[in-house]
């Protein structure tokens, strides 16, 4: 009798994706983040679903409904803390996943990579509209500042901003539609993640060496199911202490005050995972220029595959490219720090230099390093 998992129409898909999938034998822990992102998404959808049962998307009651969840709902405090800190874990895994893709040349699977960039943008959008929902001071002013950037678009900007707001400013209509967006987007993310996997399984996984691994494959189960399970345990070992012992350490104290359109916080800033892009936005004195730089900081990932000029796929055997990659990492950490600082010297000039270096590294230095390494590979005698 033929095994059911190999013949049943639904089981067959699961089998080919997670059980009998041929995987390279040498993929390292850096390949764990895909499954960790899947776990993060499931945690976010489940906790968000239960939070949505008790949340009210009205300007008068949104803030108090969140307080009610934390005080009166059974384990409401845990749901909220897991959801808020789960977002931080989600972005941490996302950044490491993208970093792995850049370091090991995974971006050469162009369809998988481009869907991944769209996923990154969608997750960022979801996190932004979600941050507005508690209707604290930073929620309100963050929404005001970021949506106001739309008005920088020539001709249609103001109309577009008012269309998003549902009025002449961020108000009840804005909050209601942001809640609707925040509810629907995770399911769109889930669909995109399936497409992401679909394209990945067309080519198979890349590996640290960048060499075609077809001659040395092992089944996904039990080897990588066990490895992914270990990754999941480690993820929870970070998330649970964070959510249970220090749930507010990554948030802004300003958000403990209800939204007040008449009082501006001394320093408006987004959550830590947006600070690098926020620093790039602020580094350009012109409003439209800042918006374009903000978009370019993420969309630049789309052209990374076309800037790959090296004959080798990964950075594993390319010391110059490795050095530039770690400079880029340090630069992004610097931008994250700058994004959280007030707009004054020396932070302004540091932010401008770090922003310029970010674009130069990706557009100029990394492709040149690839060409230089190609030249170094040629025999000189």
UniProtKB/Swiss-Prot annotation:
PANTHER family: CYTOCHROME B. The chain crosses the membrane at residues 33-53, 77-98, 113-133, 178-198, 226-246, 288-308, 320-340, 347-367. It is a multi-pass membrane protein. Belongs to the cytochrome b family. It comes from the Eukaryota. Its main location: mitochondrion. It comes from Phascogale calura. GO terms for cellular component: mitochondrial inner membrane; respiratory chain complex III. One of its GO terms (molecular function) is metal ion binding. Heme 1 (or BL or b562) is low-potential and absorbs at about 562 nm, and heme 2 (or BH or b566) is high-potential and absorbs at about 566 nm. A ubiquinone binds at residue 201. Its cofactor is heme b. It is found in: Mitochondrion inner membrane. Component of the ubiquinol-cytochrome c reductase complex (complex III or cytochrome b-c1 complex) that is part of the mitochondrial respiratory chain. The b-c1 complex mediates electron transfer from ubiquinol to cytochrome c. Contributes to the generation of a proton gradient across the mitochondrial membrane that is then used for ATP synthesis. This is Cytochrome b. Heme b b562 binds at residues 83, 182. InterPro entries: Cyt_b/b6_C, Cyt_b/b6_C_sf, Cyt_b/b6_N, Cytb/b6-like_sf, Cytochrome_b, Cytochrome_b_C_euk/bac, Cytochrome_b_N_euk/bac, Di-haem_cyt_TM. The cytochrome bc1 complex contains 11 subunits: 3 respiratory subunits (MT-CYB, CYC1 and UQCRFS1), 2 core proteins (UQCRC1 and UQCRC2) and 6 low-molecular weight proteins (UQCRH/QCR6, UQCRB/QCR7, UQCRQ/QCR8, UQCR10/QCR9, UQCR11/QCR10 and a cleavage product of UQCRFS1). This cytochrome bc1 complex then forms a dimer. Binds 2 heme b groups non-covalently. Heme b b566 binds at residues 97, 196. Coiled coil: none annotated. Keywords: Electron transport, Heme, Iron, Membrane, Metal-binding, Mitochondrion, Mitochondrion inner membrane, Respiratory chain, Transmembrane, Transmembrane helix, Transport, Ubiquinone. GO terms for biological process: mitochondrial electron transport, ubiquinol to cytochrome c. The lineage of its organism: Eukaryota, Metazoa, Chordata, Craniata, Vertebrata.
């Amino acid at each position: 009798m033929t095994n059911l998992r190999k013949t049943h129409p639904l089981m067959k898909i699961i089998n080919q994706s997670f059980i009998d999938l041929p995987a390279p034998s040498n993929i390292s822990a850096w390949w764990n983040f895909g499954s960790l992102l899947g776990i993060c998404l499931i945690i976010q959808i489940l906790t968000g679903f239960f939070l949505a049962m008790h949340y009210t998307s009205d300007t008068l009651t949104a803030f108090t409904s969140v307080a009610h969840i934390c005080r009166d709902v059974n384990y409401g405090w845990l749901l909220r803390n897991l959801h808020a800190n789960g977002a931080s874990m989600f972005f941490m895994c996302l950044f490491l996943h993208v970093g792995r893709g850049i370091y090991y040349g995974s971006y050469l699977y162009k369809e998988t990579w481009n869907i991944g960039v769209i996923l990154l943008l969608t997750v960022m959008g979801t996190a932004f509209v979600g941050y507005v929902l508690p209707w604290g001071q930073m929620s309100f002013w963050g929404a005001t500042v970021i949506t106001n950037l739309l008005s920088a678009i020539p001709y249609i900007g103001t109309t577009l901003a008012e269309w998003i707001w549902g009025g002449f400013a961020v108000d009840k209509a804005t909050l209601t539609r942001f809640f609707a967006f925040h509810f629907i987007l995770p399911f769109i993310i889930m669909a995109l993640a399936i497409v992401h996997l679909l394209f990945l399984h067309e080519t198979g996984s890349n590996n640290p060496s960048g060499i075609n691994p077809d001659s040395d494959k092992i089944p996904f189960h039990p080897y990588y199911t066990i490895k992914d399970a270990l990754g999941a345990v480690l993820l929870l070992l970070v998330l649970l202490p964070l959510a249970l012992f220090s749930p507010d350490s990554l948030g802004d104290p300003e958000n403990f005050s209800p939204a007040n359109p008449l009082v501006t916080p001394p320093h408006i800033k987004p959550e830590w995972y947006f600070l690098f892009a926020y620093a790039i936005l602020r580094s350009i004195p012109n409003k439209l220029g800042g918006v374009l730089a903000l978009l370019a900081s993420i969309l630049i990932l789309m052209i990374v595959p076309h800037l790959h000029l090296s004959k080798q796929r990964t950075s594993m055997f390319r010391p110059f490219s490795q050095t530039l990659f770690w400079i880029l990492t340090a630069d992004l950490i610097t931008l994250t720090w700058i994004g959280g600082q007030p707009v004054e010297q020396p932070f302004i000039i540091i932010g401008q230099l770090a922003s310029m270096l970010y674009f130069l590294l990706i557009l100029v230095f990394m492709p040149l390093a690839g060409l230089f390494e190609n030249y170094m590979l040629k025999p000189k005698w």
